[in-house]
Amino acid sequence: MRAHDDEFNATVNKIHLNKVKPPKVVVAGIPQGSGRMHGKDWMPDPQDQQTGATELSNEEIARQLELRFGSLQDGIYAKMVEKVGDRLYWENWAREIGLIAQKFIERIARVVKEGLHKEAFVEFLNGLQKNLNPSIDEGQAVEMLAQHMITRPVFDALFKDYQFVKNNAVSRSMQRMLELLESEAMEKDTEVLNKFYENVRMNVGDIDNLEGKQTLIKNLYEKFFKGAFPKTVDKLGIVYTPVECVDFIIHSVDDILRKEFDCSLSDENVHILDPFTGTGTFITRLLQSGLIRPEDLERKYKNEIHCNELVLLAYYIADVNIESVFHSLVKRDTYLPFEGICLTDTFQTTENEENVLDQTWFPENAANVDKQKKAPVRVIMGNPPYSVGQKSANDNAQNLSYAHLDKRIAETYAKAAQATNKNSLYDSYIKAFRWASDRIADCKDGGVVAFISNGAWIDGNAQEGFRKCLEDEYSSIYVLNLRGNQRTSGELSRKEGGKIFGSGSRTPISITLLVKNPAKKGKATIYYHDIGDYLSREQKLKKISEFGSVDSSELQWEIVAPNEKGDWINQRGGIFDSLIILGDKEDKNNKQVVFVPFYSRGLATARDAWCYNSSSESLNANIKRSMDFYNDQRYQLSKGFIKDVEYDLTQISWTTSVLNLALKNQEITQDKIGEKVISLYRPFFKQIGYYSRFWNERVYQLPKLFPTSKYKNLVICVKGIGDKDFSCLIADCIPDLQVIFNGQCFPLYWYEENKNKQQTLSLFDTESSDDYIRRDGITDWILKEVRTRFGNARKITKETIFYYVYGLLHSPKYREAFAADLKKSLPRIPIVEDIDAFLDFSYAGKQLANLHLNYEEIPAYEGVTVIGDRQKEEAPDGRMIAGTTDLYAVKVDYKYYEVEKMRFPKKGQKDTIIYNSSIRIENIPDEAYEYIVNGKSAIEWIMERYQVKTDPSSLIKNDPNDWSREHDNPRYILDLLLSVINVSVQTMEIVKKLPDLKLE
């Protein structure tokens, strides 16, 4: 029936949203006796009642059965939606609306470009720029009109009584512009629009309760936006805040107001602002919370509750949500629009105090913004935008800059920070804290800022200045760390637990309440609580709900005393600073370091799918295709045929540097600007890489370490600054930036260009051995220092020190003692007191280096069993011990050894790996998984990386089996896995025998 009747299909999928069940779907039964049964009309037949039954009146029996049957009906309806309904119904409908929105955008763009009302549209655009942000362009204005066209019929159908389009100030302005444009609409356009409106009425009409309407709007908002306007989502970090978190914040604010200021959210002149309201959840939950006394509700609604939203669709949804909740709570004869909501960019409102808002197209909205700016706001709460900038130029979704706000950050957070890289201080959520802090400072009586936000600031190295300023600017600070950092991996990721925003955000999340009480002087008292390890999202939300407020007796607050470095948690100790720094680029004259200042970050291509591949042939083709497209776009730009490049991710991955090359009309060709090299892309996973100053976004100082593929070197890659656990790995080829998280590479040698080289090239030579001069990466100072400590021991060389560093960095005691320091700075090295211990560390480092560099040549671990159908011809039981000659005698072919994706038989069973449909590896020892590098075991790196993958953006396929084919070794991947198992076991054997490290 659903397949043949769209209206019935919509009815079934609306059942769970409605309280009154649809007449088209009746749940009824037929009794065995003569009684009637149709819904609640069933009455038992006296002849069917057994003798000796409890004496109850027919009316009582009927009442009880009615209750039971009503419960049964609800259960059947729920199952009907689950079993018969389409789980993807609303998601698919949102996707369809997204496609329609794109058609609307194309239609409007055509009309405003060529139509009679072009001048009116320019005035309209000017109004948006004045009300929202000067950066609003024509395309964004067209998008907003399309959003209005989508929103209008949905709200008309859902909220028939509120006449939203007529009552909302911004909606009226949008409708006025659209009516001008619709006068030029073609018949085909009108037909499409009418069909869409009819579809909306069928899908969202007849929902009979406020909760169901809000659920539908929330789902539509999230799914529609992700599908129709992904760049808007990326730019603003649009996510929906769980109500458990919202309620916790609202009740916490009320409790703090009572405790600190002897007032409440309900009191007169306590103005409340949600500067990033989204769909209005904070305001609607505030109205429904019961914290505002009934007699105060209308006053609050009319005068003391304010909110802003930048995205038109979210603004509409917020307004209609707030108005509908208010009218459900306050019974009025007349409709009262909510004038506290503004369509505006919160950050922009304080950029220029003299800025005159648009009075032509958006006069009422402008008046509301002015009214809000004059209000003595005492409470600021909400969910600030999460976005931390576009990932690449392809996104074409740059975050906006705000001169005044950025200046305030520079004067405060950045000035107080010691970190070199301060870019993250300009992330949107940090800007929100700065803006709110300045806004609340305007209220002489003090106030509260309460945000749920990205929680990376709590322990981030770059946010040290931010933390120091919070401590100085507020009297009390409450931080509930909800964790959930899914930019980690392995055990650390599991400890972080579920993501509060589900798939909406991978960052850690925190709830922060900042209290500014003028009566309290000195630095803030900091209250901190960690939600706990290994909790799912549902468990976290349950705990937050149980807490209810910061004043809950269930919440055990820890008083934090920051150290001099600005650490609140995971505080660094004092010993680390007394150790010898690996390298110092800030002070290149500092000689008391281990390495010269030519260490480098790993290769950052910003277009990995294009610049790396398992196949040399595929890499050639990919590079050629992207460069051909680049040169075509460059040429068209230079001739004025196009104004901007085409952002087609299947042709090229644009970055800032490559865009600049195109703007300069610089032609590039594959052979002239780079070369193919072997690169270590991830631990124990080599790729063919394209190495180029032009086509790689950042090569850093790698050309000094690996000038070309001809020059050999060893580098120790250590984890860069960040919240991942420390690890390191040695490499003898160009390492990717993420072979170790944000890796810094410390070299045994570096190469200096020989400017006085002799020109002795023959006709067939391409490069002279005199092009570069090899220099030592280890400093003369550290060599002298170590030798002096050990009685001028001449047997200690720079190479000895290099391997000492590698051995020491594997010491479990070193990693444990300095875990907090290693997240916030590069390693520092102690020199052990005893020469024998020093040499033992160095020898162990050399052993580890041999394993980690020559891992492909290490034989399989004895005892690991390989099972495969082919081996049955060689052994009756189908089993052969890895490493025996019989295994290699088996006739091979590439198809047999191909891998699609390796896996474990089931979760938690790691002694066996299913290699492919024919081959299985068993008896893998537990200790093989103890070797963790860059967040996961070496074995699991092989399993993750050696699988056939297609990049979702470029659609480039990377097949690791191509490496086997091009290296004439069909067994390469299988042998590699067997080798890495042994490498892992041997690594841990060496690590466990390292000398004891005394760190007094």
Where are the predicted features?
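Extended, well-ordered alpha-helical scaffold/bundle regions in very large, multi-domain proteins
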Residues: M149, Y162-N194, H271-I283, Y301, ...
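Active-site-adjacent bridging/hinge elements
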Residues: H117-N131, L216-K231, G290-E298, N352-V356, ...
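Class I S-adenosyl-L-methionine
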Residues: Y162-S171, Q175-F261, I575-D587, K591-Y612, ...
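Sequence-level detector for compositionally biased, low-complexity segments
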Residues: N394, A419, W435-E1000
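SAM-dependent methyltransferase catalytic-core segment centered on the flexible catalytic loop
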Residues: T281-K300, T349-F451, A456-Q463, R467-L480, ...
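Charged, often flexible domain-edge or linker segments that flank or initiate folded functional domains
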Residues: A10-T190, V239-Q372, Y478-L482, I500, ...
